Amino acid sequence: MTSSDHITEGGRIFASLKKLALPEDYLAIVDGAMIVGYHLGNALLHIHGVLSDAEHANRPSALDQRIDTLPAPIRPAFEAFAELEKLRFDYVRSASTYNDRLASVVWRHLETMQHACRAG
């Protein structure tokens, strides 16, 4: 997928997530946020020449380099993506339960990633 394809797909999934309700759908929102992060993160990696269009990173922890070595313009987005990955582990894969802070954190991290994509 190209960076444009990733941005389009990430935006489509993000719009779908916004239709879900909290707290009822918090697991789907946290899990879906990782999918949005995957698309926006890969778009940024392609745009900044870190990965070719044929290469993809499923999650920040699967990158071949640390976030602090990525190009400066995309570091905040990848820090947000790493936080989404942690939230997914804590809430989807572990036994954490919903709390009101979760909703604002998920949306804030996704908005950080979207902003980086708009900035190019």
Language model segments and positions:
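Terminal alpha-helical segments
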Residues: 1-120
